[in-house]
């Protein structure tokens, strides 16, 4: 018969091995769960600005570019619900200036960075400031914010009308719908610009429309080339009626663009039977202006 003293080293060895395995399993479990849901850098309700470095600039035209800002870690996401925007801040001429932008990137598949499409205006404060940033320079960002959040099943169909950089929230929603095989939401987008070269993200938009039967895009130009097949001039009530879905309980009309354009579209939408848009849009509104 073995003595208890002879069994003691065996028991100690057993406990040591069990402890090591417990630590390994615990570490693996922590790693799995900590990496299964990427950490969101921004949280709704945050009042403090966070700084992010510019890591890439992709020029789209003579006055527009996509600016890519890096997040603290490659596994991080910005923390932006679909349809929301962020505020950029900079000290310009001794004053703190803020502007809102909708990132074109998405938490769904863009990790470690976020993209913002900005058109630079001669008298623009933030847009000019960002255009002069060098790689490695930081930008102050706060958010997310906004009254619109897209989730699968929100509506059966969208009418979207935008001008210029007003494409950014529409693109974010379109990209999300196109990435989800189960999302069959119908989208009719009317995108207006002055010149053909002003059409932002056209290659990406055309690719989305070509690969998704539920997404249709119609372009409008003020100054159209001779071989142009889209509409010419401003977005009229007739264009809205022809290329957007009729008003209904499962339809929303989304608007984003210059104030005069939005004002005209709100009036035209009422004439077509849509509910009158409120001064500040809410998610439940039939007509939502970003």
Curated annotation (Swiss-Prot):
Domain called FAD-binding FR-type: residue spans: 47-151
GO cellular component, one term: mitochondrial outer membrane
Bilayer-crossing regions: 13-33
UniProt key word Oxidoreductase: yes
A biological process term (GO) from this entry: tRNA wobble base 5-methoxycarbonylmethyl-2-thiouridinylation
InterPro entries: CBR-like, Cbr1-like_FAD-bd_dom, FAD-bd_FR_type, Flavoprot_Pyr_Nucl_cyt_Rdtase, FNR_nucleotide-bd, OxRdtase_FAD/NAD-bd, Riboflavin_synthase-like_b-brl
Classification via CDD domains: cyt_b5_reduct_like
Cofactor: FAD
Catalytic activity: 2 Fe(III)-[cytochrome b5] + NADH = 2 Fe(II)-[cytochrome b5] + NAD(+) + H(+); 2 Fe(3+)-[Dph3] + NADH = 2 Fe(2+)-[Dph3] + NAD(+) + H(+)
Annotated SUPFAM superfamilies: Ferredoxin reductase-like, C-terminal NADP-linked domain, Riboflavin synthase domain-like
Enzyme Commission number(s): 1.6.2.2
Record's bilayer topology term: Single-pass membrane protein
Main EC class the enzyme belongs to: oxidoreductase
Residue numbers binding FAD: 131-146, 157-189
Pathway(s) served: Protein modification; peptidyl-diphthamide biosynthesis
Purpose: NADH-dependent reductase for DPH3 and cytochrome b5. Required for the first step of diphthamide biosynthesis, a post-translational modification of histidine which occurs in elongation factor 2. DPH1 and DPH2 transfer a 3-amino-3-carboxypropyl (ACP) group from S-adenosyl-L-methionine (SAM) to a histidine residue, the reaction is assisted by a reduction system comprising DPH3 and a NADH-dependent reductase, predominantly CBR1. By reducing DPH3, also involved in the formation of the tRNA wobble base modification mcm5s 2U (5-methoxycarbonylmethyl-2-thiouridine), mediated by the elongator complex.
Family per record: Belongs to the flavoprotein pyridine nucleotide cytochrome reductase family.
Quaternary state and interactors: Monomer. Component of the 2-(3-amino-3-carboxypropyl)histidine synthase complex composed of DPH1, DPH2, DPH3 and a NADH-dependent reductase, predominantly CBR1.
Name of the protein described by the UniProt record: NADH-cytochrome b5 reductase 1
Organism encoding this protein: Yarrowia lipolytica (strain CLIB 122 / E 150)
């Amino acid at each position: 018969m073995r003595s208890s003293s002879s069994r003691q080293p065996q028991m100690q060895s057993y406990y040591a091995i069990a402890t090591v395995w417990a630590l390994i399993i615990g570490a693996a479990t922590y790693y799995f769960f900590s990496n299964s849901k990427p950490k969101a850098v921004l949280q709704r309700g945050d009042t403090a600005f966070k700084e992010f470095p510019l890591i890439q600039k992709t020029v789209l035209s003579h006055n527009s570019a996509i600016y890519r800002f890096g997040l603290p870690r490659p596994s991080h996401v910005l923390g932006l619900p679909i349809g929301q925007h962020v505020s950029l801040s900079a000290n310009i001429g001794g004053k703190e200036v803020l502007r809102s932008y909708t990132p074109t990137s998405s938490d769904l598949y863009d990790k470690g960075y976020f993209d913002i499409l900005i058109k630079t205006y001669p008298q623009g404060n933030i847009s000019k400031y960002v255009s002069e940033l060098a790689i490695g320079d930081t930008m102050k960002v706060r958010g997310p914010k906004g009254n619109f959040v897209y989730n699968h099943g929100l509506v059966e169909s969208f009418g979207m009308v935008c001008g210029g950089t007003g494409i950014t929230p529409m693109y974010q929603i379109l990209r999300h719908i196109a990435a989800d095989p189960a999302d069959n939401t119908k989208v009719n987008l009317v995108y207006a610009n002055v010149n053909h070269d002003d059409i932002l993200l056209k290659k990406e938009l055309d690719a989305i429309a070509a690969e998704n039967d539920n997404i249709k895009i119609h372009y409008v130009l003020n100054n159209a080339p001779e071989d142009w097949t889209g509409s010419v001039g401003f977005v009229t009530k007739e264009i809205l009626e022809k290329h957007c879905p009729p008003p209904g309980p499962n339809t929303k009309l989304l608007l984003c663009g210059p104030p005069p354009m939005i004002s005209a579209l709100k009036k035209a939408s009422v004439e077509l039977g849509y509910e009158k848009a409120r001064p500040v849009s809410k998610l439940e509104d039939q007509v939502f202006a970003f």
